[in-house]
Amino acid sequence: FVPDPTYSRSGLFGYGIAFIFLTTHLIFRWVDSGHFPLSNLYESLLFLAWCLVFLQIYLEHFMKTLFLGVFTSPALLCLIAFTDLSLPEELQKSEPLVPALQSNWLVMHVTVMIASYAALLLGCLLSIVYLIFSQVFNSEKEKKNLELTSRIREETKVIVKNNKINDDSITEPTFRKVGPTAVLSQKFENTSFFTMLDNLSYRTIGIGFCFLTLGILSGAIWANETWGNYWSWDPKETWALITWLTFATYLHSRLIAGWTGSKPAWIGSFGFIIVWICYLGVNLIGQGLHSYGFFQV
């Protein structure tokens, strides 16, 4: 999988333009409202998109993962389209912060949590892509191997017929060497793309897990200052813990159990759903200390 450098540079340039526009938009909302723009769902989704674009630019520019935009661009497009086109206008307006959010911990806690969601979602998306491509790869590989085996057998029969020898004299090593088409199978043994995809998913999820841990700890300190206790089993807190345990399991499977490939990718794919439940699903309930009105964070 070798992307065209011209297309890759064009894509990176497009991401740079998107990053500038998102940054400008967030700054204008910050100046207009007088506080960091994280008071409702619209602003949090904008910041999530900003974090995803930043991660995309970082990974492509510094880690030379030129293929990443092929998978992340559609997801980002859907996210921004949902943010701007689906949410009601009243939810897109800047609002004054409720008393519970009027704290310096807002920037420390909420930004870190959303940054963790961005990294985790990106890593999980790569896990999903890994599973899809590996399935396609294995199916294509099996098909090609069957075709290759059939062609080799046909060539072997021709050799046997032309040389008037018995089939028993054709040994297994001879069978493997017969026919120039055998080299075709080597093309399907190159798994460097899958290794890169697997490692990139692992590293991105690891970054997201670190941010998630910091976000939970900072949230606990803020909760103690605001409500008098570090943990209250609020729905948001509970699902944040579930999210943390899910990705702790993922990292444990990689670091301790030594899993690679499809096994941890399945955990990452499951984590994709868990993150969205923690980020959006809990707010749909409209209950708990983290609910400050309909669709607000």
Predicted segments, located by residue:
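Extended substrate/cofactor- or partner-recognition/assembly subdomains adjacent to catalytic sites
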Residues: 141
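Hydrophobic cores of alpha-helical transmembrane segments in multi-pass integral membrane proteins
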Residues: 1-94, 101, 105-135, 145-187, ...
